Amino acid sequence: MNNATPARACGIDFGTSNSTVGWLRPGEETLIALEDDKITLPSVVFFNIEERRPVYGRLALHEYLEGYEGRLMRSLKSLLGSKLIKHDTSVLGTAMPFKDLLGLFIGQLKSRAEAAAGREFEEVVLGRPVFFVDDDAAADQEAEDTLVEVARKIGFKEVSFQYLSLIHI
């Protein structure tokens, strides 16, 4: 890629509290607005029982705080490397694998970024901590493998990682 060509890949920082998506374009802001012209999306999903749908980010928090009946799920990143990732949770009366829950949220990041960019992204660079799980190399590798699996399932054909401590935006 030369400096006059937009990058083919997007970068996703899937955070415990908030997430961001970046796309390198000449002369443009790197971070993409994901919700209400804001570059962050709270890493939250609310399953609204009344309307039988998931909502994400600030809208999820709003509906929860307004008293809609449902289930709020936060800190989704903490599933990575945990034993829970191999299990299901009850969502809107059905069993949902935790991996699918991650896919819903990361898929939402992808679709919002694509809508804002006016193009599809088939390549992604995912930010990752130095260790998803301290002192457990197998769990750390499983966390990374899970992210690759989820990213491919939602449509990314190429997946790579960048340690977050090295990212400078």
Question: Regions from the language model: what does each represent?
Answer:
Residues 27-157, 162-163:
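Phosphate-binding loop and its immediate beta->loop->alpha context
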